[in-house]
Amino acid sequence: MTSVEQAKQFAEENFPHGPEKLAEKMGIEVRESVLVGCDGWVLSGPDGIVIRLNSKSPVQRRRFTLAHELGHLLLNVPTVVGESIDDVLKSNDREERDVNLLAGELLIPESIVRRLLPSTPVVASQLTKLAKHAKVSELAAAIRVVHLAAEIGLENAAVVYFKGDVYQWNFSKTLKIEEEWATHLFKEAKRKKPNPIRLPSGRNNDSVIVASIIENPLLNLSTFFVQ
């Protein structure tokens, strides 16, 4: 069985096709078909391991699902048949968050983030570039950057997800973000887009909050990155 560290090294060497190449290396069959109400699952049987992906999902979403299911296998965390990526991304379950972190590492190795984001602050255009380079969604790219905030020089970082103008959830390792505050910042950022907003942080120093929006008008969804 491939170890976690071996898997991460292999994914980095095969970027941006790490998860696909890793599944092949591990002898896992990846199948795509129409699934109702879920993005995919992994099943082990007498004939081997099969990862099923929803063929109706966008390619970036299928790639994250593949990496997520590989994470379940590598971390030996039981999977739930019929998982929705929307649910697992906002989950507070520790094991699911560990799986999501590993999925991000397989999709976007730290070396790639450092190379494409050589300086801070990180703004929407940089996240879009990172997402395209890694063949992932802007949301996946933003979450990966949040995980690596300290490593790339960000004191704080958070990603907040909106549907229309309605707050859905947020993820941060360092910030406690209230819905009311996030919604206020989001509305301010919408008025300034495509430029980021810069506001005083309210601390007793000269630090500022920098935030910007990546919109998906087709699905009426927005990834809001705050630092």
Which residues are covered by each model-predicted region?
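Active-site hotspot residues in diverse enzymes, especially metal/ion-binding acidic/histidine motifs
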Residues: M1-Q227
